[in-house]
């Protein structure tokens, strides 16, 4: 098994578990006592594991959702590696514990160490007609899968999670929702009220809404610490990601390719460091609510207050516009009051507190230059 690029906040030394490798060691080898379960369309209902469910009790569980639910008891200490072969559909599963998303991974309490990997084997592994919900969990890895026709979200990392690593997925359309902006499904990979997660090396094919970050309700003492790196946003529309109440989000080395609405969007007091990305024919590479490029039209962020972006070393071509606070772009003159992002000349540059959002008077957190913050990246 090759060792993947383990970087970003999921691997920060500041995080609770310091890894998101699930059933694997950080060198890419399987943990010695890991249980490996092979799942195909024919075995998803019948795959068996004897799970420790109480201090002096084990339970024989049949079916992939039943096994994962038994892990929620919090008594099983062995890592579990679920390996999916070929295409597994919702109808192939024994059942689903999330009526809105599909397969559910849930810990007993907030931030429970699951030591769980869900991965595809080979180049054609696919889950179809359902997604995966992760809640109350930590040290969970999801990788090497195609995700097709998912129910609500493709991957939903929702509430009290940390050290979650989602990588090397191919994500296609989801099932159409009831809202006008859900024709391609809802979120491809959404992260809500969760910390120290890395979303990396994923390919989003023509997605409608790639990724929401939402720490609602807003809490001035809460930080998300999320990383998005080496993703390919391939003719997807928006939310790459859309960051609401999101504190300390690192977005780097992503490829934005023909995006019809916008790249990175920040609202509600968020701070994002956007560096070394390529924006090619992305309409508005970076946007903050109610100012800059967003203020030119009707607004795309539901009139939420603005957020702050520090931009550094990005390559932009074919955009409709970019407004920097402190420097002219090739598209427009600088505007210190109504801007999309602050343009840093050096990576170590701090954004002065005099630069604030028009709505909400938010300043940039400067988390990326704080020596006490380990972003999980070696520069």
Located regions from the model:
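Extracellular beta-strand solenoids
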Residues: 84, 105, 120, 134, ...
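Extracellular beta-rich repeat passengers
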Residues: 1, 28, 36, 245, ...
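Extracellular/periplasmic catalytic domains that process cell-envelope and extracellular macromolecules
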Residues: 29-32, 75-76, 110-111, 192-193, ...
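Acidic glycine-/aspartate-rich tracts in secreted/extracellular proteins
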Residues: 87-90, 123-124, 321
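Extracellular beta-strand-rich solenoid/capping regions of secreted or surface-exposed proteins
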Residues: 52-77, 92-117, 126-143, 148-162, ...
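Acidic Gly/Asp/Thr-rich repetitive segments characteristic of extracellular carbohydrate-active
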Residues: 7-81
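Extracellular beta-strand/beta-solenoid scaffold signature
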Residues: 96-106, 128-132, 149-158, 178-191, ...
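Right-handed parallel beta-helix
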Residues: 114-115, 119-124, 138-149, 161-177, ...
